[in-house]
From Swiss-Prot:
GO terms for molecular function: rRNA binding; structural constituent of ribosome. This is Small ribosomal subunit protein uS11. It comes from Solibacter usitatus (strain Ellin6076). One of its GO terms (cellular component) is ribosome. Pfam families: Ribosomal_S11. The lineage of its organism: Bacteria, Pseudomonadati, Acidobacteriota, Terriglobia, Bryobacterales. GO terms for biological process: translation.
Length: 135
């Protein structure tokens, strides 16, 4: 059997990620019944940092708790603090239990919250909702 030819000398060159300094941004909190996702972006919508209850190791029904949402918000805020983020506008979406605790965690992480806006999509009688649970 013939051996495969060995490629000589070409290494992949990766472009180094430049650190942007952002002072104001937008925090998107998506709070569902099963999980809470916190994304911090600049004014144009480019993501600076993100975190979720599931990515922090919470599993199953623990992902939907207010404590998990608080931890997710703290983690995302600490990552964003490294880029110099100080002032944010918060946009909360969804019916989950982690809405208030995530917003509170942002202010304790040293980020000034300028405005809180609810952007939960409400249908004008669109799709049929899922059937009611029988427990």
């Amino acid at each position: 059997m013939a051996k495969a030819p060995v490629k000589a000398g070409k290494k992949k060159s990766f472009k180094k990620k430049e650190k942007r300094v952002v002072h104001t941004g937008v925090v998107h909190i998506q709070a569902t019944f099963n999980n809470t996702i916190v994304t911090i972006s600049d004014q144009e919508g480019n993501t600076i940092s993100w975190s979720s209850a599931g990515s922090l190791g919470f599993r199953g029904s623990r992902k939907g708790t207010p404590f998990a949402a608080q931890q997710a918000a703290m983690t995302a805020a600490n990552k964003a603090n490294e880029t110099g983020l100080r002032v944010v506008e918060v946009r909360v979406s969804g019916p989950g239990s982690g809405r208030e605790s995530a917003v509170r965690a942002l202010s304790t992480a040293g980020i000034e919250v300028r405005a809180i806006k609810d952007v939960t999509p409400i249908p004008h009688n669109g799709c049929r909702p899922p059937k009611k649970r029988r427990v």
